[in-house]
Structure formats: C-alpha cells, structure tokens
Amino acid sequence: LGPMFVDLIAQRQELAAWVGYDDCEEFLWDWSYNREYFPEDLDGYLQEIQQELVPLFEAVQESGLYDQVYRRRYGEQQCLAYLSSGANAMGGGIQEAYEEMTGRALYDIAPSAQKYEGSFEIYLTSYDAPFVFLNPYEDISDFLSFAHEFGHFTNDYLTGGSYVTTDVAELMSQGMEYMSLCYATEPSAQVLDTARQLKMADSLGVYVGQAAYYSFERQAYQLTGDDLTVENLNAIYSQVAQDFGFDSVGWDEAGWTEITHFFTNPFYVISYVVSNDGAMQLYQMEQDEAGAGLELFLELLETEEDIPLLTLLESKELESPFERVSQVAETFREEFDLVTDGAGR
C-alpha cells in the first residue's frame, strides 16, 4: 500500500498542476470540500490540540480504561436494543427514521468474516432510501458505530437524500452518538455508563488522532520528486506519532497505510475533528438542560443544503471549534478526573 499511496500523491500533484494550482492540498481542498476555513487557519488549531489535549490523551491511554471497556462481548440484538431504546425516547424524526430502517430492513449489522472491513451509510437511489452497513467488532463500540451511521441515515431519510457538506454530515453522525447516550435505556444502566466512558475517550481520541492524521497528510503532500518515498512517509508518521502521543500506546511507522481516507478521500479527516466539536456542544447543551440539545439536533437533522459547517453553527448560536480547545480540555479533565499543570500536562 505504501508505493500505491506514493503514486496517488504524485498523480494528484500532477492533476493540481494541470489545472493551475501550485499547492496540491489547496487544489484538493477547493475541489472536494465546501469549507469556510483553510489549511493556513489550522496551524494554530493543531498546536493548541498538541498542547492542551495530547497530554490528556496520553493519560487516558495509560489509565487502563480501554482494557475494561472492551472486556465484554455484545451481539446484534443488544446493539439493536441500544439504538431502539434511544430512538424511541428521542422521538420525532429520529424515531420515524429508525422505524423505517428496521421495518424495511435497511441495515446490515450482522457479524461475518466475509464482510467488508468497515462501516458506512449510503443512499440507495433505486430504493429511494438510505442503508446502513456495519461490520461489527462484537463489543460495546458497535453501539456507537451503529448510532454514528444511523445519524447519517436519519439525515438522508428526513431530506430524501441530503447534499450537506462533509463537515455537516459528520456533525449528524457524531451528534447521534452523543444523543443516543443521553436517551438510550438498554441494555442496562451499567453498560450505558461504560458506553458513555468509551464515547468520551473516543471523542478525545478524535480530536487528537484525526488531527494527527491531518498533520501527517499535509506533510506527505509537500514531498515531491525523489523525496516522495515510502521511507520518508514512514519518517513523517513516526514524528507525528511522537508529536501527538501515539508512542504512549504503541505504534507502527507504517500504520498510516491502514487509514482508508488517505487513499480515497484526501484531506477528509480534519472534518472529523471540527464536526466532533459541534456534536460535543450539543451534548453539553443536553447535559445542562434536558431536551435542549435534542431539540436543536432534531432541527439540524433536517438540513439538506450544501452549507458550510461554521455558517451552520453560527446560525444556531453555537461556537466555532477553533475557539474552544481550552474549554474542551477542561471538559475532558473533569470527565476523567485528570489533574494537569498549567501547560496541560
């Protein structure tokens, strides 16, 4: 896969030059995404994530939380029970979408060794309906993965096939993860508390991990000519692993080859970071006032136009992700009862 990615970068650089771009990242950004922020706007954001969130990420990795979370196995029926209880409690368009999905069997979450390794939601025009595909790990993470794809499903169902931007689409999916945790009642209170801990740890991991992937990606596309080699890509990833705390949990210098988006959707991964922040704001609203986050989320799920995320957040009186890193860090400190010094460590 390494040589394949080298070829892809070279071909994309050639295409960028052919249409008049000096910078391949700028070309891919302009042609693929409707964003109101640009690569140069993210320099300070990445630095803040490194300073404020990486130390917390390292502390959580060392806490043993994941060993506890993944110890127990869960099956398809428990996964359905989780989302069903949450959707019914949330009501409105969410409940309607869930009934459509299950009533017409517009999902596949059964385990199989022959299934594609991954999860996704897609709108099937021949069925005039969305469809959810999940290759489960048969652990508690499946609850959140199913909710994630169901967020996309609900947005597509309510709009008849949404045309929202990448960032906004991920707000729908990650928002559903958070809201499902607030309203699900199955399988049990203990399991739901474990799922909430996992989601918060996963959210911290999204900030740090996806920011790290973006940092790697933008450096990779700066390599040209004889410098564009697998060895140099491995070296960049090794440095990124140190910068973002991956070396605290073990890593492989060629681990970047496992990130599908690098091959299929260049510069997509930063969308996970900024949309996760918007989704977390919904969760915080819900925690502060029961029903407030859900009410706004139900409105957002009916978004269908190609509107940039920052404009959408502002229109709903939510904050810009780029102004919240310190606040987010404090939320995680409280969640995981972490004590750090003034530098975030």
What annotation goes with each model-predicted range?
Residues L1-F131, S315, E319:
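Contiguous, non-catalytic segments that form substrate-binding/exosite surfaces or channel walls
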Residues L46, V164-V206, S275:
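Post-HExxH zinc-binding segment in Zn-dependent metallohydrolases
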Residues A89-G93, I122, H152, D156-G160, ...:
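Conserved helix-loop functional segments at active or binding sites
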Residues T125-F146, L158-S162:
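Short pre-active-site segment immediately N-terminal to the catalytic Zn-binding motif
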